[in-house]
Amino acid sequence: MNIAVSRSAEEPSARTQVQWSLRWENELQLADHAELADFFRNSYGPTGAFNAQPFEGNRSWAGARPELRAIGYDARGVRAHIGLLRRFIKIDGVDLLVAELGLYAVRPDLEGLGISHSMRVMYPALQQLGVPFGFGTVRPALERHLTRLVGRQGLATLMSGVRVRSTQPDVYPNLSPIRIEDVLVVVFPLERPIGEWPAGTIIDRNGPEL
């Protein structure tokens, strides 16, 4: 899961100022993509110039392209974002339909306000998609943050000790076409209980991460 987040507790004034919009990808116009691309460059840039490179021009996605986005706005424009894509993954060879979450970011000037808590706005949309599970991956260092965001509310289960194989978003002459990462897996039980998530330590995306 491409992710740029704040780690502090949310202030009530910050929460009430954001207006959320759920947008299907076909609903976005060129101006929307341009605004989102600028938002992602500013959000991911502080984490490293390489992380901001995918958003050059008007490109508003980094790897796989989302089909649904939750976008938070305030008077200054885009404030926060999370994307969603339905796809099949393999868990130790078992096919599973999931709604993958990614492109998770908060505007840099709001770091310290914890507006990332408002990403829970996506959960009702997840429940309406008819998929068994929501799925995402984050760095292990973000375990405490994700536990505060979704784990304590019972929205998701966090799993460690899992390796995820993905393709690069493009073909690079100096890189392997496959990425293998040791990550923290975030699972949202939707149509099926968490006990029906397949056991396994290898997840294959067979495509780039969201």
Swiss-Prot record:
<comment type="similarity">
    <text>Belongs to the NodA family.</text>
</comment>
<keyword id="KW-0012">Acyltransferase</keyword>
<keyword id="KW-0808">Transferase</keyword>
<keyword id="KW-0536">Nodulation</keyword>
<dbReference type="InterPro" id="IPR020567">
    <property type="entry name" value="Nodulation_prot_NodA_CS"/>
</dbReference>
<dbReference type="InterPro" id="IPR003484">
    <property type="entry name" value="NodA"/>
</dbReference>
<dbReference type="GO" id="GO:0005829">
    <property type="term" value="C:cytosol"/>
</dbReference>
<dbReference type="GO" id="GO:0016746">
    <property type="term" value="F:acyltransferase activity"/>
</dbReference>
<keyword id="KW-0963">Cytoplasm</keyword>
<comment type="function">
    <text>N-acyltransferase required for nodulation. Acts in the production of a small, heat-stable compound (Nod) that stimulates mitosis in various plant protoplasts.</text>
</comment>
<protein>
    <recommendedName>
        <fullName>Nodulation protein A</fullName>
        <ecNumber>2.3.1.-</ecNumber>
    </recommendedName>
</protein>
<dbReference type="Pfam" id="PF02474">
    <property type="entry name" value="NodA"/>
</dbReference>
